[in-house]
Amino acid sequence: NLNYKNEKQIEFHRKELLKIYESCCLENTVPFEGIIELLEEINSSGLAWGIVTNKPIKFAKRIVDHFLSQYKPNFLVCPESTGERKPNPAGLVKACKLVNSKPSLSYYIGDHLIDIQAGKRAKMITIAAAYGYIPPGQSPLDWNAEYIAETPIQIKSFIPELSK
């Protein structure tokens, strides 16, 4: 347990880190290889899609606007949208409501254990992105996702509307 003094110090350093990140959040940021092709196929299929992230909205919106706006995500749900962070499923449930989709018929793709936990708690079909930012010592094989994708393009084979 942290005492109040330590929590205060942590919050101070977190705010300082976010100031630095704000000035450089687009540097060295690129979509994973194959993501653009996947998004083009999703858009062609007519499926709704979007992003649920733990990233604060001011950073997430900037990144999405810069890299993905032409692919027209249907939603961007950040912690400010629900007051909760993953693994709490509130953001995923909200995303499904925004596109009038039942969670049980919706897919959630994540590159972290908490993403898959949130998807499971929301009763969604989960896909672990093994090509993502996997923390050292973790394996998507241990996350109990319904599917594991080694590449973005492999995701198509798990979604019937895309595998035709």
In which residue ranges do the predicted regions lie?
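Short, mixed-charge, low-aromatic patches
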Residues: 1, 14-19, 48-54, 111-115
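Secondary-structure transition/capping residues
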Residues: 9, 28, 32, 71, ...
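Low-complexity, intrinsically disordered/propeptide-like segments
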Residues: 5, 41-42, 95, 161
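Short, acidic loop-to-helix structural element flanking the phosphoryl-transfer center
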Residues: 23-51, 57-65, 89
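Pocket-edge positions in alpha/beta enzyme catalytic cores
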Residues: 2-5, 23, 27-30, 80-84, ...
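A metal-dependent, Asp-based hydrolase signature
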Residues: 1-23, 33, 37, 41
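Asp-based, Mg2+/Mn2+-dependent phosphohydrolase catalytic module
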Residues: 56-164
